[in-house]
Amino acid sequence: MYGMLYESVQHYIQQEYGMETWRKVCQIVDCKHQSFKTHQIYPDKLMPDFAAALSASTGESFDFCMNFFGRCFVRFFSNFGYDKMIRSTGRYFCDFLQSIDNIHVQMRFTYPKMKSPSMQLTNMDDDGAVILYRSGRTGMSKYLIGQMTEVAKEFYGLDMTAYVLESQNDICGGTAGPIKLTEGPLTVIVKYRLDFDNRDYMAKRVNVIAHPSQLKMPSVDLNVFLELFPFTIVLDHDMKITLAGEKIVETWILHNPGVNPKTFIGSHILERFKCRRPKDTQIQWETILQMRTVLFEFELIRTGHNRAAYDAALNFDFENFDEASSLNEAQAMALASAKEFSAENAKEEAAAAATSKDEIDPATGQRRHSVGLRSILLKGQMFYIKDVDSLIFLCSPLIENLDELHGIGLYLNDLNPHGLSRELVMAGWQHCSKLEIMFEKEEQRSDELEKSLELADSWKRQGDELLYSMIPRPIAERMRKSEEHVCQSFEEVSVIFIEVMNIYDSGSNNIQDAMQAVTTLNKVFSALDEEIISPFVYKVETVGMVYMAVSGAPDVNPLHAEHACDLALRVMKKVKAHALPGVAIRVGINSGPVVAGVVGMKVPRYCLFGDTVNTASRMESSSDPWMIQLSNYTALKVQKVGYKVEARGFVKVKGKGEMETYWLLEGPE
């Protein structure tokens, strides 16, 4: 959702409930935004989250809060001058209800990423009306009631109450569209009953119907009608094209060279046109009947963009095509006039594509610089004609200037004789729809760029995680800065060695035994990895059956001995809990000075050097199963802070002679 919706929530919560309540709401929601930007997109889930938080803070119901947010938005958008747009839709509230979708269409030029719902007025009487709401979001039905109530009160002076008659796929408190695994996202459909004083509007309708100007006129022949509206399309209940005006057929043939013209009549409208407005509309009979007051915009689907289709057009046998069997005389004449233009246009496009320095899209064969520049848009309204039980799309093409008119193979006398179509083309007006297409193309490229950047960031994070598994983060950051000296001496650290025992019989040549040993070792080492808590303890390496860790490096830690002992105690407890048959571990810990640095080029490793490391290794190798052996210095250090140790006595250590060692029994209380 755009930030303007959340701006209204923030403003009126602060105004009516106080700044402290707003802070509490943000704290409950864990909202990091101190303020909202009008044209920035924010997560949809914030709206129900704010409503739930306000409900918890004030004691009001969730539905009341969503209704309150809807009323707040209507009051708030008047600051942007949008109240004038609402007031200009008509004298009556029903006029506004019929214009909601058209308002959303216009608002998309300012808010291009707006995912607006669709609303149609389905029934009216003296006591109110019924509207049908469709949306890809759930949980917003009470929000809409708040909006409708406030619009009726502020702009039309009506006291309105609303309630839900029917509801499909709506989920209270949600915002993402419901999903069916076999079909994908579902549409939320809610039918509302709006109760208000609608007598004035109904009386006006009766007066209009009874006016002498509305007396029944003689029938008009359909051919005459198609001459008056040469871009008309007639649709049956299956939304298939049953009839079409002369110019729309001619235009389709010109821009679909190589396609059998017989296929136009009888085809589904979405096979020949793409619905651009209203967006995400289901092109079905019942749906379109309810949207007769809504402005529609269709884009002609052309094979002319495809270079292969243009090449095929050069060899298309127009002479042997039997057009008279499916097209009327005017349409057949249009086909005849298209013969020369189709081949000529195909040659021009192919030559331009061959000589152009612009990139050709390998998927579509389109020249990237021309995408969207010559799209043919038809803008108009759907009407139901009872006499023929059909829908008629009365439309006219949106053409920017004379250059574009010639580019799509039309002339001024081809345009509708009524209206200002010809005058606008002569004046060179820039239609907003053309700008919108260009904007959508750029937005699509922007989205692709964002996805590429996100993918690059993901790869970078994976690379960082791999690097940090071999080298500590502080050291890696220093290496990135091209620091030559990454070696560091530490006055005192605690080194831990953990060996897994009885895991593999070295005399066995059985592959299954070896695989079992690897699986068991992986379980133990994975359990040890889970107990490593950075930055208190750092895993150095694993060699064979031995696991090495250190506390106090690379991050200096004055409590290194305590953290090393804590790790050893946790590891003992966790490995015992796994109850691996015959498997045991032994641990050795020693404290003292070390030197640390990165060694290697292809597979760099963070290594520790010094007598402290050797002594810690001897503490482990001379320890007993399920025991933790400490050097004398480490034992005295942790004993002072409450760790329970037991003297083992003097142990003969390779290269050291006899050393006094201790068993670590448990940590402090």
From Swiss-Prot:
<keyword id="KW-0963">Cytoplasm</keyword>
<protein>
    <recommendedName>
        <fullName>Soluble guanylate cyclase 89Db</fullName>
        <ecNumber>4.6.1.2</ecNumber>
    </recommendedName>
</protein>
<comment type="similarity">
    <text>Belongs to the adenylyl cyclase class-4/guanylyl cyclase family.</text>
</comment>
<dbReference type="InterPro" id="IPR042463">
    <property type="entry name" value="HNOB_dom_associated_sf"/>
</dbReference>
<keyword id="KW-0342">GTP-binding</keyword>
<dbReference type="InterPro" id="IPR029787">
    <property type="entry name" value="Nucleotide_cyclase"/>
</dbReference>
<keyword id="KW-0141">cGMP biosynthesis</keyword>
<keyword id="KW-0547">Nucleotide-binding</keyword>
<dbReference type="Pfam" id="PF00211">
    <property type="entry name" value="Guanylate_cyc"/>
</dbReference>
<dbReference type="GO" id="GO:0000302">
    <property type="term" value="P:response to reactive oxygen species"/>
</dbReference>
<feature type="binding site" description="proximal binding residue">
    <location>
        <position position="104"/>
    </location>
    <ligand>
        <name>heme</name>
    </ligand>
</feature>
<dbReference type="GO" id="GO:0046872">
    <property type="term" value="F:metal ion binding"/>
</dbReference>
<dbReference type="GO" id="GO:0046982">
    <property type="term" value="F:protein heterodimerization activity"/>
</dbReference>
<dbReference type="GO" id="GO:0019934">
    <property type="term" value="P:cGMP-mediated signaling"/>
</dbReference>
<dbReference type="InterPro" id="IPR011645">
    <property type="entry name" value="HNOB_dom_associated"/>
</dbReference>
<dbReference type="GO" id="GO:0019899">
    <property type="term" value="F:enzyme binding"/>
</dbReference>
<dbReference type="Pfam" id="PF07701">
    <property type="entry name" value="HNOBA"/>
</dbReference>
<dbReference type="GO" id="GO:0001666">
    <property type="term" value="P:response to hypoxia"/>
</dbReference>
<dbReference type="GO" id="GO:0055093">
    <property type="term" value="P:response to hyperoxia"/>
</dbReference>
<keyword id="KW-0464">Manganese</keyword>
<feature type="domain" description="Guanylate cyclase">
    <location>
        <begin position="494"/>
        <end position="620"/>
    </location>
</feature>
<dbReference type="InterPro" id="IPR011644">
    <property type="entry name" value="Heme_NO-bd"/>
</dbReference>
<dbReference type="Pfam" id="PF07700">
    <property type="entry name" value="HNOB"/>
</dbReference>
<dbReference type="GO" id="GO:0008074">
    <property type="term" value="C:guanylate cyclase complex, soluble"/>
</dbReference>
<dbReference type="GO" id="GO:0070482">
    <property type="term" value="P:response to oxygen levels"/>
</dbReference>
<dbReference type="InterPro" id="IPR024096">
    <property type="entry name" value="NO_sig/Golgi_transp_ligand-bd"/>
</dbReference>
<comment type="function">
    <text>Heterodimers with Gyc88E are activated in response to changing oxygen concentrations, alerting flies to hypoxic environments. Under normal oxygen concentrations, oxygen binds to the heme group and results in low levels of guanylyl cyclase activity. When exposed to reduced oxygen concentrations, the oxygen dissociates from the heme group resulting in activation of the enzyme.</text>
</comment>
<dbReference type="InterPro" id="IPR001054">
    <property type="entry name" value="A/G_cyclase"/>
</dbReference>
<keyword id="KW-0408">Iron</keyword>
<comment type="subunit">
    <text>Heterodimer; with Gyc88E, in the presence of magnesium or manganese.</text>
</comment>
<dbReference type="GO" id="GO:0020037">
    <property type="term" value="F:heme binding"/>
</dbReference>
<dbReference type="GO" id="GO:0005525">
    <property type="term" value="F:GTP binding"/>
</dbReference>
<dbReference type="InterPro" id="IPR018297">
    <property type="entry name" value="A/G_cyclase_CS"/>
</dbReference>
<keyword id="KW-0460">Magnesium</keyword>
<dbReference type="GO" id="GO:0038060">
    <property type="term" value="P:nitric oxide-cGMP-mediated signaling"/>
</dbReference>
<dbReference type="InterPro" id="IPR038158">
    <property type="entry name" value="H-NOX_domain_sf"/>
</dbReference>
<dbReference type="GO" id="GO:0004383">
    <property type="term" value="F:guanylate cyclase activity"/>
</dbReference>
<feature type="coiled-coil region">
    <location>
        <begin position="430"/>
        <end position="458"/>
    </location>
</feature>
<keyword id="KW-0456">Lyase</keyword>
<keyword id="KW-0349">Heme</keyword>
<keyword id="KW-0479">Metal-binding</keyword>
<keyword id="KW-0175">Coiled coil</keyword>
